[in-house]
Amino acid sequence: MSKHLRITLVKSLIGVAEKHRRVVAGLGLRHTHHSVERLDTPEIRGMVNKVPYLLRWEELS
C-alpha cells in the first residue's frame, strides 16, 4: 500500500503571493481548514515545501 499525506490549509491566503496561491490551488485546497489526501510523491512534497507556512500535513499509512 502506498503512503498518503493529509494536507490542511491552516492560514488564510489574503496577502499571499500569487505563485503561492497557485501552489495551494494545485494541491486542491480551497479555503482555510480544508483538508485533502494526496499520494506521497516527490511532486506533492515539493509543492508542500514551497508553502510550509500555510499548511499542516501528516503522513498516513
From Swiss-Prot:
GO CC terms of this entry: cytosolic large ribosomal subunit
Coiled-coil features, chain-numbered ranges:
none
Which keywords fit this entry according to its UniProt record? Ribonucleoprotein, Ribosomal protein
Pfam families xrefs: Ribosomal_L30
Extract one GO BP annotation from the record: translation
Molecular function terms, GO-annotated: structural constituent of ribosome
Subunit text: Part of the 50S ribosomal subunit.
Q: Could you say which protein family the record assigns here? A: Belongs to the universal ribosomal protein uL30 family.
From the Swiss-Prot or TrEMBL record, give the protein name. Answer: Large ribosomal subunit protein uL30
- Source organism: Acidithiobacillus ferrooxidans (strain ATCC 23270 / DSM 14882 / CIP 104768 / NCIMB 8455)
Upper taxonomic classification of the species?
Answer: Bacteria, Pseudomonadati, Pseudomonadota, Acidithiobacillia, Acidithiobacillales
